[in-house]
């Protein structure tokens, strides 16, 4: 009889433990910035609005992710993250800092938001994920400001490839993070690359490109670093900006109450069987 009871209880335990896997199945989420409302109108071609931190909030939170921003009231400058839906692909220079070179967000839906990053003087973690969020990747492209600067040159930065087109220029985004085991990893993505032997292969990214970030594991703080072959006395000459949209993450929920109860029953069964063995031995 005891063996029959034990078998039935253990069968129930097996079912509950198998349920643990289902309870912990990951599901995908997307940080798409659509719950945010840009507050400053852009007066250039295409119109649209942007937010650059001038309200002094120091950043924004959306879909469980925190994006840091620093705004300097003295100079009206900013660094870290902003968000925008401007669509100017033709105006060069710093007045057009908030437009993706695609002229539209990743979903190709006019008026939708995306994020724009401007590198601080000292790169530091600027994107923090909520607990249990594991980054999978994001869609990334150039800003119009950076792309036209590399394509044509300007008063501060060179034309990529130089006059002949043979100079091996590049513009690199490095995304790094440290996982829960203390392991640091970096993912590199070239926003422009003119290092090819055949100049026809040289490129400046002008579409939304998927960047796989699974190598970063469960890192909760991400650091973004921009570097370029065009460096002068005061550092990098290439405008230190890029655009990001639809950051994809997986999220593992906490164990459910059912699983917790199941574990308790399993322990209770073990105690029950031990007492039976002791009773039979007496």
Residue ranges of predicted features:
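Bacterial N-terminal signal peptides
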Residues: 11-21
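Sec/Tat signal peptide C-region and signal peptidase I cleavage site
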Residues: 22-28
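N-terminal targeting leaders for non-cytosolic proteins
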Residues: 29-126, 130
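Terminal, low-complexity interaction segments
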Residues: 34-37, 167-251
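Extended extracellular/luminal ectodomain segments enriched in beta-structured repeat modules
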Residues: 130-137, 219
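Short coil-to-beta strand junction motifs in C2/discoidin
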Residues: 150-173
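A short, hydrophobic C-terminal helix/tail in secreted or cell-surface proteins
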Residues: 254-272
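C-terminal membrane-anchoring or membrane-association module
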Residues: 270-282
């Amino acid at each position: 009889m005891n063996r029959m009871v034990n078998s039935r209880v253990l069968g129930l335990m097996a079912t509950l433990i198998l349920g643990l896997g289902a309870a912990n199945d990951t599901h995908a989420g997307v940080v798409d910035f659509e719950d945010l409302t840009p507050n400053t109108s852009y007066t250039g071609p295409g119109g649209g609005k942007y937010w650059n931190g001038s309200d002094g909030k120091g950043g924004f939170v959306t879909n469980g992710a925190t994006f840091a921003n620093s705004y300097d009231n003295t100079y009206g400058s900013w660094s870290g993250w902003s968000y925008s839906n401007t669509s100017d692909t033709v105006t060069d220079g710093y007045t057009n800092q908030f437009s993706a070179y695609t002229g539209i967000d990743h979903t190709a839906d006019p008026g939708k938001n995306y994020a724009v990053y401007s590198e601080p003087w000292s790169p530091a973690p600027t994107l923090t994920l909520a607990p249990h969020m594991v980054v999978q990747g994001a869609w990334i492209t150039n800003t119009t400001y950076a792309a036209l600067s590399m394509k044509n040159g300007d008063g501060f930065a060179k034309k990529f490839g130089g006059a002949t087109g043979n100079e091996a220029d590049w513009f690199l985004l490095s995304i790094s993070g440290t996982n829960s085991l203390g392991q640091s990893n970096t993912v590199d993505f070239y926003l422009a690359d003119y290092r090819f032997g055949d100049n026809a292969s040289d490129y400046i990214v002008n579409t939304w490109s998927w960047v796989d970030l699974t190598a970063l594991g469960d890192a909760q703080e991400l650091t973004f670093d921009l570097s370029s072959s065009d460096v002068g006395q005061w550092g990098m000459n290439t405008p230190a900006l890029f655009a990001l949209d639809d950051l994809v993450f997986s999220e593992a929920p906490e164990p459910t109450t059912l699983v917790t109860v199941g574990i308790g029953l399993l322990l209770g069964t073990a105690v029950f069987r031990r007492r039976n063995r002791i009773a039979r031995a007496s």
